């Protein structure tokens, strides 16, 4: 039913107080939770029966007052004994947070999206419509029917209340039913623990990280962009000079003519539109002529400029002055987190220009959490963040006070100079996981002695003392170490190292002869996956894989490579998620003013007042190194600095 009068609201709230568990689904005006206003609240606590509370709608609609509903719902949602079901709950928690409702972590019950991700990590979508068809075998009202799609999309505010109510109520009802089915399936398949104790408690940690965001120095990005423009122009002139005439570097057609017709370079591979000019081809051709190398550099720099230097400033939130990336919990089938808008996990750090982008990510005290809230809401500072706020705790938000709040906190002599970033990075985490799984004596001993693992492997395979290992030998050992994790073929290794296939094959054989435990682990993993149909991580996360052959040779096919990699990379992902929970818990317990901002695969980035850095270093290192007991010690490298590029070991 539609709850659109104060009397109906009072009656519903009275009933709602008695429900230990219900599903809430918010309809909003925006996909960005920090800009979204709530259009309506859909609530369901038993199948087939849902309520809709409209707070925004077309002119003339009968609506409830938004602030009144927020106040009424606050006491219910902030009650730690409640259990709340919701599809993609991370989004709704952020919207609620921006409206001053801080839902306790323990309140989160089942998010069908996250549950389905554990049951079927390779699925193309874990969206609500997909899940309704998959588990309940029915179709639901599509959001497209309500607001259209593409250019003609209208805002949820303009959907008639009856239509919005029908859509939202059905969503809440079906989400509740899905939650029960998915719970049963998770328990049946032995995945409930992984959901309840790892993925579920991670949600509020990600909410907090996304809400805090990270400060970006837009002026620094503009300066870097300007200097890249100059370099790109110079490069273009050099390229045209070598070719002997001007042409469009970004046109594959024109590039084909220059490389293969004019310079007569050999065609390495064909596509539908003629000879390929992709990265791999250019890298091969670069050995024969200087032009392809210049093209590679030009492509790299123009991608950096477009994707990061020019795009990042526009992603800075106007009200917080920070970038708020989204951490995706249900995208990577290995169990890793991914990040988007912007993707901070693939800033290329292999080149000086790519690495320099990190200089623009800086430490800063100011997070105007109040600035996130909509005008008219009154917001309460969360207990764990008391140190960041003024003495009085409740702020009615209007545009003017929002600005003064921001000012008052910046002017307290606690300038940005007094804050720093802290980066904590697991050292060789995947190779340590490999040592743990394979129980290979040589590998374990090297890690126990704390020697450089690539040097140790080079010494073993080349049969020389560690002191005598050359830089080139170490580089080869490093390529093999990582090649093993990803099941690289002699052909792939040869290409990576620029040696011939026979030499690469001999090197791989030498490696497996010395590290027989690793060879055995790979064999056993492939037999298990062949038998069960899935690879399993250290915490029991599964990834389904077909195509493991019964009679294999040394060079693995794609599914076999995926199988080995899923166990290693997936277990490393489990480990860092455990570490995030442990660090977050300790920061809250000790009311430490530091805060976790980013997770970049094996690295966590924090921000802290300089005075509190020593305690944060200890806390982070201790929790990360003890997140899980492996057969080899976990080592964490911690460094501190004003920005993400220039940090010094702590």
What are these regions (language model features)?
Residues 65-81, 360-363:
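Short, basic/hydrophobic alpha-helical segments
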Residues 230, 234-237, 241-294, 513-561, ...:
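C-terminal polymerase-core module
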Residues 103-121, 128-130, 450-454:
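Conserved beta-strand -> loop -> alpha-helix junction used to position metal-binding or nucleic-acid-contacting
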Residues 78-81, 94-97, 120-123, 136, ...:
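Hydrophobic alpha-helix feature that most strongly marks membrane-spanning transmembrane helices
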Residues 154-157, 208-211, 317-332, 337, ...:
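Conserved catalytic core of nucleic-acid polymerases
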Residues 1-59, 87, 104-107, 123, ...:
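Conserved "right-hand" nucleotidyltransferase catalytic core of DNA-directed polymerases
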Residues 366-378, 382-383, 395-411:
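Intrinsic, low-complexity polybasic segments
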Residues 428-467:
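Basic, low-complexity segments
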